[in-house]
């Protein structure tokens, strides 16, 4: 959101058939989780930016830190219970993950591949970050994809019928 130099990547990903979801505009936990209204103001801001690129506001969301984050209660106690319900009331679906590459902390490509390929659920939503400084994620991704394809997994764009991973909400 706050990095307009990457805005054109939204359209490029969309044109390649990827589902575009929203995270936040600011990714500032103190701002986003200051109140329910603050969360939706930030979400609306990223929604408007995405709409300029692809022609509509996506209905798929991932909360900063996931729905199970414990940071939000530092700013507003109980906010996650309200937000998970309210995003669905507004017609959106939020996604968490049931597998993580571990790229939220600095790791080598080999460590990311080992972590990301350690899951064996029927449906896997794997958390990887595409932000600045995640070159090891970019390097690991082909190996991760190859691993799961060799096990018979398929990769599909999310839609309303996709498997949804939800964490337990922490307030």
Task: Label the predicted regions.
Residues 19-24, 59-63, 93-98, 124-128, ...:
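Structural recognition of the beta-strand scaffold that forms the well-ordered cores
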Residues 1-57, 147, 163:
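Active-site beta->alpha N-cap acidic-glycine motif
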Residues 133-171:
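C-terminal domain-boundary segment and adjacent tail
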Residues 1, 25, 64-66, 99-102, ...:
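Active-site beta-loop-alpha junctions enriched in small/polar residues
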Residues 7-11, 81-85, 142-145:
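Short amphipathic alpha-helical segments and helix-helix/interface helices
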Residues 1-6, 15-16, 105-127, 134-136, ...:
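Accessory recognition modules or surfaces
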Residues 28-54, 69-123, 134-140:
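Alpha-helical scaffold elements lining the catalytic groove of polysaccharide deacetylases
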């Amino acid at each position: 959101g706050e990095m307009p130099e990457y805005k054109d990547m939204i359209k490029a990903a969309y044109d390649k058939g990827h589902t575009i979801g929203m995270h936040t505009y600011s990714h500032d936990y103190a701002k986003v989780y200051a109140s329910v209204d603050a969360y939706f103001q930030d979400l609306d801001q990223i929604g408007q930016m995405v709409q300029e690129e692809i022609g509509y506001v996506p209905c798929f969301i991932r909360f900063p830190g996931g729905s199970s984050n414990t940071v939000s209660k530092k700013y507003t106690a109980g906010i996650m219970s309200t937000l998970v319900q309210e995003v669905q009331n507004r017609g959106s679906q939020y996604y968490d993950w049931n597998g993580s590459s571990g790229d939220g902390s600095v790791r080598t490509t080999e460590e990311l591949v080992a972590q990301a390929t350690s899951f064996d659920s029927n449906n896997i939503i794997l958390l990887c970050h595409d932000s600045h400084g995640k070159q090891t994620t970019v390097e690991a991704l082909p190996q991760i994809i190859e691993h799961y394809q060799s096990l018979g997994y398929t990769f599909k764009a999310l839609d309303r019928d996709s498997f949804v991973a939800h964490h337990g909400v922490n307030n």
